[in-house]
Amino acid sequence: MTAIEPGYIPLSRSGELERRAEALEARLASCDICPRNCKVNRLHNETGFCHSGFLPIVSSVCAHRGEEPAISGQRGSGTVFFGNCNMRCVYCQNYQISQSWREQKSNEIDCKALAANMLYLQDDLKCHNINFVSPSHFVPQMVRAIAEAAPMGLHIPIVYNTGGYDSLDTLKQLDGIIDIYLPDIRYADNKTARKYSQAPDYVVHNRAAIKEMYRQVGDLVVDKNGLAQRGLIVRHLILPNGLAGSEESLEWISGELSPAVTMSVMSQYSPQHRAHKIPLLSRKISVAEYEGVVGVLFRLSMENGWLQELSSSDTYLPDFEREGHPFDTDPKEVQETLSCREFEGVPHSIKKSPKNGGLRGLNITEDKSSPQTGERAQ
């Protein structure tokens, strides 16, 4: 079997990556990059809902060991945290960088500098992938940086780590560029999305986006070391009082996509930012709420992915005001504090993940061809 090569590499060689970057940048003149369709001229630094102009805002660059095992591996995911956001989640754990627009202005860099940071993550920190967090409002800048870095030797997979409020037209221009899509499916009800994230049309855009992502990359494929090379992982954060619409969202994934879609079901919710002032969001999830979602996974025979242990809400929250690494926690400590328990009634294929104690692993397809990206990462 031919080794998996990141999709952006042949696109770079053919010149298509440069053409995509130019086409996306042109759309900034009347910005419609995300579903907000603000129509401001970001080429001239006009700003809309996301408070972002032309230059990318990069709030942190680090090797992140707290992602899913197939993303973090042993040496971490090369994470690029973009500042600002196209949503306004009242419980956002990254609120220090997502909702502090004036402060984030100082984190603007040009795309050449972003490309250099990507190569630093790959070559110096030996990360397994480049993981763009909250990229929806900076897609043109992201693609431009990939186009700059590819001829300079970038060769590891690209992860698109998004809250899921993405434009279908924008995603279509990412076809072949993104190797691994990591979207949230945050809500099943638009009224809830409007109330808590100021995204009144979230569900229709989110579901269309996830369908398109699945069309592009399909089911998750990992190398011989369990590292993701290509595919879709859908994240779902359980919220208290059923606000995430977990059952409806999981039923939609199972019915509209496939029960085989790789899921990352997270129990780590804790009331951050303004959530502690909102009664329905002011507590962690209960055991009954957690077990209810596990029961839905069982009923739908969704056996691929990871299930986060209930105790995971207690630790490992980022602090972007800390000097250096926002997750300045000993990796061993993370493994211990995010430990999982066996859960009676969950499909028999679920097992404790050997790479990250905080996520219970399920079945994932292995690419037995020893992809070059996996071999280089060892």
Predicted regions mapped to residue ranges:
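Short glycine-enriched, charge-decorated loop/helix-capping segments at active-site entrances
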Residues: 96-107, 195-200, 277-284
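Conserved Radical SAM active-site core
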Residues: 50-181, 190-191
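Alpha-helix-loop-beta-strand connector modules within alpha/beta enzyme cores
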Residues: 146-155, 209-213, 289-293
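Conserved radical SAM core fold
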Residues: 98-99, 139, 164-167, 185-203, ...
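Anionic-ligand binding region
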Residues: 194-198, 203-224
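Non-cysteine beta-strand/loop elements that form the S-adenosyl-L-methionine
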Residues: 175-190, 260-269
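Hydrophobic faces of well-ordered beta-strands that scaffold small-molecule active sites
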Residues: 78, 130, 158-160, 181-183, ...
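Auxiliary Fe-S-binding modules of radical SAM enzymes
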Residues: 1-46, 218-378
